[in-house]
Amino acid sequence: MGNNTSKPSRKPQRRQHGRKAQSVQISGPSGGLQMIPTPQRDGSGRPLVHGSFEMNRDQLLIAFQYMAEYLHRQGVNLCIYVAGGAVNTIYLRSRHTTGDVDFFGANDKSRHLRDASKYAQQRSTCQLGANWFNNSMSLFLTRTIEQDLIAAARRQNAVLFSKPGLAVYAVPWEYALCGKTDRLTKSDRRPYDTSDAVAYLSQCIKGNRGRAIQAQQVEAWARKYNKAVSRSVLIEIDAAYKRSHGEHGIMF
């Protein structure tokens, strides 16, 4: 398990040295979910699209460290739950980099998280980008599913980072796997989606005492989490798993 432990690069990674840290003003009292980062529009009212930069494991952990220090100074200790490339990069180490950190949790303290993420962006010696830390996945979670995921993630206890001020947990592996089955059914699937699915399937199998997962079980998880799945996608994932592990990971 990692403690103090994607997306293809869209722009070359740029490092900035000797950059002076700027002060961040803490917002007023929190009042429910706030989007992170705060949505912005240009002069004509169109949403601004921020560039993204690839971050490696060390850079992500340093950014989390800055966030933890900031939150600890504010007297808060928050838990968040992360999906996607940050999990692969930090915990599973199945990717070298990721373009952002997708998370949910601590909705009532989201202003603190927003300010902490800005502080980390300012302190970091690498370019994180304005969208490096975002909770847009919260928009797609019902209250019931979110609470279920939080409880399951705490039981799973796959910790990406934990210091006074901030603890970061991976989402349940079955949820992560279903996120990839959903993506693989769509036309905008990405080159790394299948390998990500294999990494998550491997964790599901470990939790199943080393036994392959029944296809019906994956389909049940997908229904539970409102994710798409198809037999052809499961066959594709299983074939990729067999190539890398020498045995089937999904039973049909």
Language model features with spans:
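Compositionally biased terminal segments of proteins
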Residues: 2-252
